[in-house]
Every structure is written in structure tokens, then in C-alpha cells.
């Protein structure tokens, strides 16, 4: 006998993915520590843990998409959860990046004698902010405009236009990442070159990591839009991706001003 549901909430079925994700995280942590201390088998355990985590992410999100798209479990009330959950997640990422900005500002405003008492430190050849960084700025901001275009297209029910906009967004993101990689390759300093190199590569690298994650997020949204999964009433996943991408845009502006321009004077 099937009982009727008299509420708008989704009661999920028992799932093995939380425990499998926990085991993957445990293997990754232990393997990472073993690898850093040159223990035998550390690299193997680390690799297996990462593979297990990636597999768990794939099958777990597959189940969520199936429940929302095919089974219709994600009502308007259920959709509020992912929406509200995305906000503190993005705020936590802002705080993470704020720590890198703080480290850079502290080191530049009060340079120690170990780095010559000046900023940038003695012997560091900084990157010109008006070359690749300046070129990357309109590229990334244009990708943010394209994702907004995609959002308006979804709300208007124009599926093909939304796909085109997402293709433009992802293409610009890949160009940005390519230029960033070129800049790293040509950089005259490394992450081990004083506090300047450490804060530069940590801040820009962490932002670049977010760009890559956001690009993958938008690629999935583009595939789902092409398959007809996203509608003007139901596109929470895309909204989360768009918010995340705008967060990446704003952080880049702060990076350009504080790390590249002001930090390199």
C-alpha cells in the first residue's frame, strides 16, 4: 500500500553515499599525510581516496538530479534549501580568500627586515598588472555578463539562447584560465620566493581553482540546458552556478587591485 504525501518536503531514501564520501575523505587525509612524510603507499592511498571522493560526488549528484528532474521531488519548498545553503557557502569562501588578502596587506604594509624592509621584497621582479592581468579582467567580467544573459534566457523560456550564452561563458572562462596558466609559466618568481611569492600564488591560485570549479559547474548546467532539464520554474542548480560565478568575478577585481596593482607598486 502506497501512502500519500501530505506535505511539500522530500523525504530522501537511505543512501550509501555519505559513508562512502567519508571513507574517501579519510583515505585522502591519511594518504596525504603519508605522502608528505614519504611513507610507502602514501601516494597510492591518496590517489584511491581522491578517486573515491570523485566517484561519490558523481553518483550522489546523479541521484539528486534524478530526484529533482525525473521524479519531481524538488518542490518550491525543497528548492529553498539549496538556495539558502548556497549563500553561506559562498560567504565562507569569501572569508577564506579574505585571509589571503589580509596576509598580503599585513606583509606589504609592515615589511620585515628579512625581506629588505621594502615591498615588493628585494630581488623580486613583479608582474606588470597592465599586461595579462588587465587583459583577463574584461574577459572574466564578460563571462559574468554572459551568464546573466543565460539566466534571462532561461526565465524567458528561450532554451537555445540560454545554451549559446552558456557556451560563451564557458569559452571565456577557458580563455581566462589559459592566460592565467601562461602568466604562471612566465612568472619570474615562485611560491617559495619570500612572502610575496607565497601570498601571490596562494591568492591567485585559490581564485584560479574556483574558476575551474565554476567552469565545470557551468558546463554541467549547459549540458542540462541542452537536454531540457532547466525550466523557468526549476533551475536552482543554474542559479547556484551563476551566484558562484559572480562571486569569482568580484574576487578577481579585488585581486587585481590589491595583489597585482597596489601590491606590485
Curated annotation (Swiss-Prot):
Disulfide bonds: none annotated. GO terms for molecular function: cytochrome-c oxidase activity. It is a multi-pass membrane protein. It is found in: Mitochondrion inner membrane. InterPro entries: Cyt_c/ubiquinol_Oxase_su3, Cyt_c_oxase_su3_dom, Cyt_c_oxidase-like_su3, Cyt_c_oxidase_su3-like_sf, Cyt_c_oxidase_su3_a-hlx. Gene3D superfamilies: 1.10.287.70, Cytochrome c oxidase, subunit III, four-helix bundle. Keywords: Membrane, Mitochondrion, Mitochondrion inner membrane, Translocase, Transmembrane, Transmembrane helix. The chain crosses the membrane at residues 16-36, 41-61, 84-104, 115-135, 137-157, 162-182, 200-220, 245-265. One of its GO terms (biological process) is mitochondrial electron transport, cytochrome c to oxygen. This is Cytochrome c oxidase subunit 3. Its EC number is 7.1.1.9.
Amino acid at each position: 500500500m502506497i501512502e500519500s504525501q501530505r506535505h511539500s518536503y522530500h523525504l530522501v531514501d537511505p543512501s550509501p553515499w555519505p559513508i562512502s564520501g567519508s571513507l574517501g575523505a579519510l583515505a585522502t587525509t591519511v594518504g596525504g599525510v603519508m605522502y608528505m612524510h614519504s611513507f610507502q603507499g602514501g601516494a597510492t592511498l591518496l590517489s584511491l581516496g581522491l578517486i573515491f571522493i570523485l566517484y561519490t560526488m558523481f553518483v550522489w549528484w546523479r541521484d539528486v538530479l534524478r530526484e529533482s528532474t525525473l521524479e519531481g521531488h524538488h518542490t518550491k519548498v525543497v528548492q529553498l534549501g539549496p538556495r539558502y545553503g548556497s549563500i553561506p557557502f559562498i560567504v565562507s569562501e569569501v572569508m577564506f580568500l579574505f585571509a589571503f588578502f589580509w596576509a598580503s596587506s599585513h606583509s606589504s604594509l609592515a615589511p620585515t627586515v628579512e625581506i629588505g624592509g621594502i615591498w615588493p621584497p628585494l630581488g623580486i621582479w613583479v608582474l606588470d598588472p597592465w599586461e595579462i592581468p588587465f587583459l583577463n579582467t574584461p574577459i572574466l567580467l564578460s563571462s559574468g555578463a554572459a551568464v546573466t544573459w543565460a539566466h534571462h534566457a532561461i526565465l524567458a523560456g528561450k532554451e537555445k539562447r540560454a545554451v549559446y550564452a552558456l557556451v560563451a561563458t564557458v569559452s571565456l572562462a577557458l580563455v581566462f584560465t589559459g592566460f592565467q596558466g601562461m602568466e604562471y609559466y612566465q612568472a619570474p618568481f615562485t611560491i617559495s620566493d619570500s612572502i610575496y611569492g607565497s601570498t601571490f600564488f596562494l591568492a591567485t591560485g585559490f581564485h584560479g581553482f574556483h574558476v575551474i570549479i565554476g567552469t565545470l559547474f557551468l558546463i554541467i548546467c549547459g549540458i542540462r540546458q541542452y537536454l531540457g532539464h532547466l525550466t523557468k520554474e526549476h533551475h536552482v542548480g543554474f542559479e547556484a552556478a551563476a551566484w558562484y560565478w559572480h562571486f569569482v568575478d568580484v574576487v578577481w577585481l579585488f585581486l587585481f587591485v590589491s595583489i597585482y596593482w597596489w601590491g606590485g607598486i
